[in-house]
Amino acid sequence: MAAHNLIVQELKKIDQTPIVSEEGNEGDPLSTDTCWLVDPLDGTKEFIKKNGMFTVNIALMRRNKDRWNPIFGVVHAPVTKTTWFGGIVIPSERRGPDGTGLMMVNPSMPPNPVRLVASGTHRGEKDELFAQKLGNYDLVRMGSSLKACIVAEGSADLYPRFGPTSCWDIAAAHAVVSGAGGIVVDPSGKNLDYDVIENILNPYFLVAADNRWTEDWVKLQ
């Protein structure tokens, strides 16, 4: 709750844009066409395990009728002191002790293996089926929205998510991926959008460095 309070305090210094957070709302998002979407701790299991794979997620959302799209996002990993940020009008960037610079997706080309990133705690039958369709692949396990961020920075190609998530779990990283030239699609292959008011749960989604794998993704649904 302390992280939530600090984030809300700092966002309010910018303007009075409503804030939707996993820990509680500030203002009415339906009163305007934009809102902040906040997850003060993404990766609770990783936080408990003390493996460092948890993040703070903040997204600026724009409303389109009853759906919302992320236009800017910030993902911060406190343990590594690394921040990923960007969106549809701001090229994505990574800043941290290992260096600073603009990011761009870097999809693998045959005969190189597809670089697949998956959750360290959630893996089921559909994950296995999708991996089998890829054929030649390398798998990295990771927690929180870091999985999407390494796609954005060019270190992975695909992050399929078949498990349950909420809007604040991925929206910030979605913006970062978009700003790096990648895509985040729903089960039909369309750009993932969000409901931040009522049904906060996301459908399954795929984060990808490009659209080569979208057809296989849609067929699996």
Which residue stretches match the model-derived regions?
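Conserved beta-strand termini and adjacent loop/short-helix elements that scaffold enzyme active sites
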Residues: E22, S119, M142, V185-P187
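DPxDG-like acidic metal-binding loop motif
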Residues: L30-E93
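Oxyanion/phosphate-interacting regions
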Residues: E128-K133, K147-Q221
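N-terminal subdomain of lithium-sensitive/metallo-dependent phosphomonoesterases centered on the IMPase/IPPase/PAP
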Residues: M1-D42, V75, L129-Q132, K190, ...
